[in-house]
Amino acid sequence: MFKIKLTSKAKRELRKLSKEEKLSIGEIIEELKENPLIGKPLDRELIRKFSYRVGIYRVIYKINQQDKIVKILSAGHRGTIYN
């Protein structure tokens, strides 16, 4: 099982979400603890990062396999997550 770490940016983004949105993102994070490779590998300026989607929500993250850490970089609505 992987540990989850959130960047300060991800924490700020999560604070802005509604309770329902936070629950959806929380489900994504729980799944990433078990299997962080289920996300889609990103490319271009986001190389070595992953995106995991549930409905209209996305979580952008990096994986540290050696230390078993998933670092959440950004979380929120798919329309604003890549800005």
PLM region descriptions:
Residues 1-23, 31, 54-57, 62-83:
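Enriched for short, Lys/Arg-rich terminal
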